[in-house]
């Protein structure tokens, strides 16, 4: 039984011709029903013959992730706990911006292998990669949900900043990006998609850059290799200087810059000396910085705390004084554990990690 949402347009054409004996033109019809009209049942495809629909039901399935729980924050953030076909749980978050625009934070793996010490997802360990249909199923769930909201907000931006490291699931990420960008698919411009990476896969970074299918964000969080090795032990396997050198040759569009994400941890990476080191590092690239304040887990064993307001502002002001664009990003959804670093999918609670506004 074929997961039809896991087929690219070209793969769908091949499936219809070789498996079902259909003409190629059927692919466009079926594709539009799947990705533009969001149908869940082949019988809803009214311009497809009954015979073809019967064959589709026999040989294929349309599977959307099951919404287990929906949580709504006081700030308007919405979090979905989703169950995949094999029972695995992941989360996705809708973050409200201005003028009714919504940013969706997407997961790409069940669990995460990176083990970053400040991120709840890191405690889960890695279970498996998500498929294209599972990744894009999050978008289908979001669009269906938003269509039923009275204000009809617009799903404008997608950020791969949820569970998992995108460049460790590169093949499915690339397949997903092609479908997202397709005029026949979900019709998202590359300028509305951001892929975030810890920097663990040089070949993946090269392929993503050459594709031009998304903007790049870098989960940096430390200005030196030594500190990065302490708080992001697996990400630090790629030497920071080598990573920055790779970013120097990363292809950027006109006026495009690489976004560096920097989570401020009180007493760990938030001093003036850290700010100076950070300036020396990121000034080697076309960069802008998103400063994200740590969200305490509430666990007594949590080794980290948020910096003081004074230290946050001093850090930001130093960056600006050295002509480095830096924005303090407000993490939304903390009251439902949907803020940065809180992602830990579970039926008893849990959540993803974004601090992205439109």
Swiss-Prot record:
Disulfide bonds join 105-340. Keywords: 4Fe-4S, Cytoplasm, Disulfide bond, Iron, Iron-sulfur, Metal-binding, Methyltransferase, rRNA processing, S-adenosyl-L-methionine, Transferase, tRNA processing. It holds the Pfam family Radical_SAM. [4Fe-4S] cluster binds at residues 112, 116, 119. Its EC number is 2.1.1.192. Binds 1 [4Fe-4S] cluster. The cluster is coordinated with 3 cysteines and an exchangeable S-adenosyl-L-methionine. GO terms for molecular function: 4 iron, 4 sulfur cluster binding; metal ion binding; rRNA (adenine(2503)-C2-)-methyltransferase activity; rRNA binding; tRNA (adenine(37)-C2)-methyltransferase activity; tRNA binding. Signal peptide: none annotated. S-adenosyl-L-methionine binds at residues 164-165, 196, 219-221, 295. It is found in: Cytoplasm. Its cofactor is [4Fe-4S] cluster. It catalyses: adenosine(2503) in 23S rRNA + 2 reduced [2Fe-2S]-[ferredoxin] + 2 S-adenosyl-L-methionine = 2-methyladenosine(2503) in 23S rRNA + 5'-deoxyadenosine + L-methionine + 2 oxidized [2Fe-2S]-[ferredoxin] + S-adenosyl-L-homocysteine; adenosine(37) in tRNA + 2 reduced [2Fe-2S]-[ferredoxin] + 2 S-adenosyl-L-methionine = 2-methyladenosine(37) in tRNA + 5'-deoxyadenosine + L-methionine + 2 oxidized [2Fe-2S]-[ferredoxin] + S-adenosyl-L-homocysteine. The keyword Iron applies. Residues 98-335 form the Radical SAM core domain. It comes from the Bacteria. Specifically methylates position 2 of adenine 2503 in 23S rRNA and position 2 of adenine 37 in tRNAs. m2A2503 modification seems to play a crucial role in the proofreading step occurring at the peptidyl transferase center and thus would serve to optimize ribosomal fidelity. This is Dual-specificity RNA methyltransferase RlmN. It comes from Oleidesulfovibrio alaskensis (strain ATCC BAA-1058 / DSM 17464 / G20) (Desulfovibrio alaskensis).
